[in-house]
Design a protein with these regions (language model features):
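Short capping loops/turns at secondary-structure boundaries
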Residues: 31, 35, 51-54, 69-73, ...
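Enzymes that bind and transform nitrogen-containing heteroaromatic metabolites
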Residues: 7, 35-40, 75-287
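Proteins enriched for Cys/Gly/acidic motifs involved in redox and nucleic-acid/cofactor modification
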Residues: 39, 53-81
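Zn2+-dependent cytidine deaminase-like catalytic core
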Residues: 1-57, 142, 162-163, 175, ...
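Short secondary-structure boundary segments
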Residues: 5, 19, 67-69, 73, ...
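Alpha-helix capping at helix-to-loop junctions
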Residues: 44-48, 67, 120
Length: 287
């Protein structure tokens, strides 16, 4: 429970006034202002305090908030839909649909849980997605496009629908001036960032906007870039029981030597329709 004054009085004061004798907490608050202080105050006041019940589940639940609080950036979930041989599309670059309807329904749930949905320029060019999963009345996501060197299609849905003001293009400095001007004129934002640290710089900008959770749904290039930048906090993969072959791999051109390759710990695995869902976090992450 919080122990400082903010928009509301401290929870610890309310607990003490209510005469509660025993408090059970799953985990400590990642906010450095609290971080166990409230529990210490309650113990000092004579209350019985039990900490750690359902700790793993609680830390998973608050992971985006904790990442934003401790690292001042969003929590990045990378979602991939893959064939069993690790392909995100066939040799014609068609990816509709690798996974089945049950998996696609779960993806919608992932989208609804995120503050922002991120894709690369290739996804905008090939698929022209709306990236707008929420029914009316629910909080609306930011839509983030990672631009490469070339222009983006100005007729894309993300620039022309009623939600264009919720679109952010992250581009290297000096990117396509005429294209950037037109996109800004449509109401979207264009953030020009250092090319060599574009994703890291973007993460800081998004943190400053209060964005806590980004779902990344781009293709292999974006997936590889995020991994190389150390910006994959959670990896969600839907495997379809189909073999495709060909060159369109899950990580684009990114590659690592085995001894330094990104490693993950399995957190969840289950069947979703005819597909297999697995959720992983970096092997060094504590949950």
């Amino acid at each position: 429970p919080c122990s400082t004054h903010g928009r509301t009085p401290p929870c610890t004061e309310a607990i003490l006034r209510a005469g509660i004798a025993r408090v059970v907490a799953a985990t400590t608050d990642p906010n450095p202002k609290h971080a166990g202080r409230g529990l210490r105050l309650l113990r000092k006041a004579g209350l019985e305090v039990r900490l750690g019940v359902c700790r793993v589940e609680a830390n998973t639940l608050i992971a985006p908030f904790a990442c934003h609080m401790l690292h001042h950036r969003p929590f990045f979930t990378l979602k991939l839909g893959l064939s069993v041989d690790g392909r995100i599309a066939d040799h014609t670059h068609s990816s509709r649909w690798i996974t089945g309807p049950a998996a696609r329904k779960e993806v919608q749930a992932l989208r609804r849980a995120a503050d922002a949905i991120m894709v690369g320029a290739g996804t905008v060019r090939h698929d022209n997605p709306s990236l707008w999963p929420r029914p009316d009345g629910q909080r609306n996501p930011w839509r983030i496009i990672i631009a490469g060197k070339g222009p983006l299609p100005l007729d894309a849905q993300v620039f022309n629908d009623e939600h264009a003001k919720r679109t952010i293009v992250a581009a290297p400095r000096g990117w396509q001036p005429s294209c950037a001007q037109i996109i800004r004129g449509k109401g979207a934002a264009v953030l020009e960032l250092p090319a060599k640290s574009l994703l890291a710089s973007l993460a800081r900008e998004l943190g400053n906007l209060g964005i806590m959770h980004v779902l990344c749904e781009g293709g292999g290039i974006l997936a590889g870039d995020l991994l190389q930048a150390g910006l994959v906090d959670e990896l969600c993969i839907f495997f379809s029981p189909v073999l495709i072959g060909g060159p369109v791999g899950a990580m684009g051109l990114a590659q690592w030597k085995l001894n330094v390759a990104p490693r993950f710990s399995l957190r969840e695995s289950r069947r979703v329709g005819h597909d297999l869902f697995i959720r992983m976090t970096p092997a060094t992450a504590e949950r």
